[in-house]
Amino acid sequence: MDVRCINWFESHGENRFLYLKSRCRNGETVFIRFPHYFYYVVTDEIYQSLAPPPFNARPMGKMRTIDIDETISYNLDIKDRKCSVADMWLIEEPKKRNIQNATMDEFLNISWFYISNGISPDGCYSLDDQYLTKINNGCYHCGDPRNCFAKEIPRFDIPRSYLFLDIECHFDKKFPSVFINPISHTSYCYIDLSGKRLLFTLINEEMLTEQEIQEAVDRGCLRIQSLMEMDYERELVLCSEIVLLQIAKQLLELTFDYIVTFNGHNFDLRYITNRLELLTGEKIIFRSPDKKEAVHLCIYERNQSSHKGVGGMANTTFHVNNNNGTIFFDLYSFIQKSEKLDSYKLDSISKNAFSCMGKVLNRGVREMTFIGDDTTDAKGKAAVFAKVLTTGNYVTVDDIICKVIHKDIWENGFKVVLSCPTLTNDTYKLSFGKDDVDLAQMYKDYNLNIALDMARYCIHDACLCQYLWEYYGVETKTDAGASTYVLPQSMVFGYKASTVIKGPLLKLLLETKTILVRSETKQKFPYEGGKVFAPKQKMFSNNVLIFDYNSLYPNVCIFGNLSPETLVGVVVSSNRLEEEINNQLLLQKYPPPRYITVHCEPRLPNLISEIAIFDRSIEGTIPRLLRTFLAERARYKKMLKQATSSTEKAIYDSMQYTYKIIANSVYGLMGFRNSALYSYASAKSCTSIGRRMILYLESVLNGAELSNGMLRFANPLSNPFYMDDRDINPIVKTSLPIDYRFRFRSVYGDTDSVFTEIDSQDVDKSIEIAKELERLINSRVLFNNFKIEFEAVYKNLIMQSKKKYTTMKYSASSNSKSVPERINKGTSETRRDVSKFHKNMIKIYKTRLSEMLSEGRMNSNQVCIDILRSLETDLRSEFDSRSSPLELFMLSRMHHLNYKSADNPNMYLVTEYNKNNPETIELGERYYFAYICPANVPWTKKLVNIKTYETIIDRSFKLGSDQRIFYEVYFKRLTSEIVNLLDNKVLCISFFERMFGSRPTFYEA
């Protein structure tokens, strides 16, 4: 029997078992049950003394145990690390057992199962039937997984089954209550193993009149009285709420491969199961494949107070306790972990994921026709957009929400007619954002037409789950994660990096016959992070070349052989004499290149120096782990280039991405005290070496010159750690034309990247030169495993401060005719606590600055004068006209209790609001507010007690005739950001004092 592993899960009854859900080549699903064991590693001496004898035991052979406690010394008399070799045993017990002096107990039992039996969680195997005992049709027991799964075979494709769902609930206040608010709609996107896709929506007929029900039937809706009458081929079905819930129960109890929702763990599934029990007394029941265990659907929460989210709220995750092999997947929590977005509402995520440039085909009376295909945007974008459009009801044109009037869809494109004001441009960005509907009002005015409209919105949201599932490649990422992390598919996204690293680490330790132990308590001290340079200036009319180190921290660990067991010791000094003596003797006792000495910042205030010494003769655990990850990533990237099918490409892309993420997480885990890889000295040395590497690259580029086909680097090409046999001559021959004459200047850098200005505004030449620079830096400047990559040309770069800049980006693969990408890093455009007015204005002024830089007609003083004069005109005009809507000035904030002071004004604001409003603001909820003052207040220069002008804005708020927006608060914040874009501080201070009566705050460089 040839099978592919698709999920692993456990039963937690009196007799615990591990189950595999697998699929054969013919699409048949097969479950295999294994005994569940707890694993313990002991020495031969302890094994022989155990009473009663262990249930099962496997010899592990001789293994080396290394004590990895850090040795701290004030001199070079460092004791050798404790190390011993002994025969070890792996013990398997069906129940937990207290065994003294067991080691390697930090690893997961499931990882032990896979590794000890040589099984890959997502592998394909030809099973040996003699080790299988049939339990029932489609379920077998296996007591010897090692022999049963001995023959691994090449991967083969299999079909999967899915259920994507969404619900709508009646509500009359802010949020539906399961006790009083019925479910009005449930929509499903059902995909079976044959690939057949069914879309259907159930409508609660109890919310309609009998006349409306009859009209719905006349218009083609199916009306049913019981579960048995359900026809899944019909798109719209009317039934009672009880039947609606019974159908939900039947569907959720089926063994799909995936049941996918958006925030369904916290709401949809919980609401369905609670409503079902309330109305019928029934529960949703899952049964294990052997039919021996039944469990009720229950949502349980994990609160990780050690990982607090925004506003001090504990990181809470929600989980479904099923035992039938279905993976219940919540896209909301997945996207929260994998994407950094302004908002995690479904409409915001959709807008980010599904967009396409559309061409205006026709302009009518308050309607416009757009067409999208491979000629209007990058190949494939229109096809994806068209797929979402099949169920879409609204399309966002730039920021205007437009209702779909008509749509034509074909394989690689679409034509859509939108209810839209007349727009003048020829092309616009189309996206799927928020449907322009007010559900509260719809329920208030509820009738048949509204019910049918809501059915369309509901099925679109269910289908959006499918579209997002495919967009994020969740299935291939799940399989890739299972293989890489040595975890079941159902657990891949449930753990943090400190846990997922344990599988690969255990695998490596067993391969190298190594056990790492600690006898002392782990200590945590702060240490300096990556090097961030101060920007040399604010605005750049010349192009700036961006060079990034490839996987800097992983390669630092490999270069320095940084690992807890390769650390010889840490030498500290409390006075200058000690430091001088230690420095003189250090290189004699620990000469490079076998050893590397890393100067770090002292861990305690009474110390003046700290030097970590690492032995580079034998590769350590962390470097070996990283080398494996990077090699595997390179292998999958190569396979990705050679792949022919879309399935192969998706798998290989997910695999290379997974290895990239896990390799980059290792540095963080070295400094995380609860991690199995914790090594304070290694983490600290990693950032120290990283800083020296970025400083070294900056030193050779800052002041470099290109002329006559020769590149003169600014400094000798000397290894910053020790002398080697490389040629250090800074003059290097290039393959560039001899008439090229350019100078280079380093203007900024951050951790692993260097921003180098070239005295040219020609994009094509800049890219050509940068690619040659990349080649020369990698071949002549860098050494060992360090490499850099030319990432992009930044044109019209505007540096606000460290980590804050705006620019037009030309990627390394583009040219001057390419459309550049606008980049806003760390600026107000990407923040949620900034008003739309602020974002719109700052975008306008950055664009204007960018154009001025591009034209090059003005010096920095003229630019400053022109910008400030224009800004004053715009602000005065807005203040006098007061024409912009309140929506542009709304801000949002999360309500929480994480305030130092009990009488915090934010808390007071919400408390007072809740006293006077039936729709209260709950903990963890975001609310909108604005600064409002009396209408007769003149322009206020000095702003004091501005918190007292905060007003919560809800659906019912209307700005009174005796009120105005307190514009000055917003204007001051906007002006503060704009003056930080300009170079002339004197002019900026003068302008700010005249407008607001105080000096501006300039960002730290």
UniProtKB/Swiss-Prot annotation:
One of the GO BP terms on file: viral DNA genome replication
Single GO molecular function: hydrolase activity
Residue pairs linked by disulfide bridges in the UniProt entry: none
A Pfam family: DNA_pol_B_3
Annotated signal peptide: none
InterPro entries reported for this sequence: DNA-dir_DNA_pol_B, DNA-dir_DNA_pol_B_CS, DNA-dir_DNA_pol_B_exonuc, DNA-dir_DNA_pol_B_multi_dom, DNA-dir_DNA_pol_B_vir_insert, DNA/RNA_pol_sf, DNA_pol_palm_dom_sf, DNA_pol_type-B
Presence of the UniProt keyword Nucleotidyltransferase in the record: yes
UniProt cross-references to PROSITE patterns, sorted A to Z: DNA_POLYMERASE_B
Function: Catalyzes DNA synthesis. Acquires processivity by associating with a heterodimeric processivity factor comprised of the viral OPG148 and OPG116 proteins, thereby forming the DNA polymerase holoenzyme. Displays 3'- to 5' exonuclease activity. Might participate in viral DNA recombination. Does not perform OPG116/D4synthesis across an abasic site.
Similarity comment: Belongs to the DNA polymerase type-B family.
Subunit structure: Interacts with OPG148. Component of the Uracil-DNA glycosylase(UDG)-OPG148-polymerase complex; OPG148 and OPG116/UDG form a heterodimeric processivity factor that associates with OPG071 to form the processive polymerase holoenzyme.
Name of the protein in its database record: DNA polymerase
Native organism taxonomy: Viruses, Varidnaviria, Bamfordvirae, Nucleocytoviricota, Pokkesviricetes
Originating gene: OPG071
